[in-house]
């Protein structure tokens, strides 16, 4: 990782440091530290506008994405968001 990217990730984490790690639904869901890190980095982006998540089955990619989308919906209230996932995860 270049020093530019490392500094940018540090900046993103500072921008989102007050962001909660819980998602209120019927039952409250708390993100694991690595999920919260990914969400913080993505939500702190202002120059890079995409993020590719890949990892093994069962590590929480869908819940991390749902958390990011819920945070974006709070920021951009006029957005319509459509999330497509497989029926069986």
Swiss-Prot record:
UniProt KW Nucleotide-binding keyword: yes
Catalytic activity: a ribonucleoside 5'-triphosphate + H2O = a ribonucleoside 5'-diphosphate + phosphate + H(+)
One Pfam assignment: SNF2-rel_dom
Keywords recorded for this protein, A-Z: ATP-binding, Hydrolase, Nucleotide-binding, Transcription
Domain Helicase ATP-binding per the UniProt entry, residue ranges: 42-89
Keyword Transmembrane helix found: no
Gene Ontology molecular functions: ATP binding; ribonucleoside triphosphate phosphatase activity
Protein origin, superkingdom: Viruses
Enzyme Commission identifier(s): 3.6.1.15
Entry-linked Gene3D superfamilies: P-loop containing nucleotide triphosphate hydrolases
Listed InterPro entries: P-loop_NTPase, SNF2_N
Range of residues in the leader sequence: none
Amino acids binding ATP: 55-62
Coiled-coil regions listed: none
Record family assignment: Belongs to the helicase family. NPH I subfamily.
Function: Serves two roles in transcription; it acts in concert with viral termination factor/capping enzyme to catalyze release of UUUUUNU-containing nascent RNA from the elongation complex, and it acts by itself as a polymerase elongation factor to facilitate readthrough of intrinsic pause sites.
Name of the protein in question: Nucleoside triphosphatase I
């Amino acid at each position: 990782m270049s020093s530019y990217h490392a500094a940018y990730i540090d900046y993103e984490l500072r921008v989102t440091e007050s962001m909660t790690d819980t998602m209120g639904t019927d039952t409250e869901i708390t993100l694991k530290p690595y999920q919260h890190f990914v969400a913080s980095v993505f939500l702190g982006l202002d120059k890079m506008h995409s993020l590719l998540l890949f990892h093994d089955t069962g590590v929480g990619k869908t819940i991390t994405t749902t958390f990011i989308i819920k945070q974006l919906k709070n920021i951009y209230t006029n957005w319509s968001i459509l999330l497509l996932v497989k029926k069986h995860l």
